[in-house]
Amino acid sequence: MTVIRLTRIGRKKKPFYRVVVTDSRKRRDGGWIESIGYYNPLSEPKDIKIDKERLNYWKGVGAKMSERVEKLSQKA
């Protein structure tokens, strides 16, 4: 199954996340199909960018969003 979730990049104690489309069987930071945005929780205000067009495309072909990505997509 295809899922839309966060993958962590950045340094130790300085998280930065990509919003990616991946297979649900892959590890959190494993390979991904497409990167559709990013999330920086440390900046003020929190920096969120998600490509709505690509998000809607992947939802249309059956990808499920994680709970965190659902909350972030409402804020973006």
Curated annotation (Swiss-Prot):
Lineage, broadest ranks: Bacteria, Pseudomonadati, Campylobacterota, Epsilonproteobacteria, Campylobacterales
Top-rank taxon, per record: Bacteria
Alphabetically ordered keywords of this record: Ribonucleoprotein, Ribosomal protein
GO biological process, one term: translation
Family recorded in the similarity comment: Belongs to the bacterial ribosomal protein bS16 family.
NCBIfam families, sorted: S16
The protein, known as: Small ribosomal subunit protein bS16
InterPro entries (alphabetical): Ribosomal_bS16 (IPR000307), Ribosomal_bS16_CS (IPR020592), Ribosomal_bS16_dom_sf (IPR023803)
Cellular component terms (Gene Ontology): cytoplasm; small ribosomal subunit
GO terms, molecular function: structural constituent of ribosome
Statement: the UniProt record of this protein carries the keyword Repeat: no
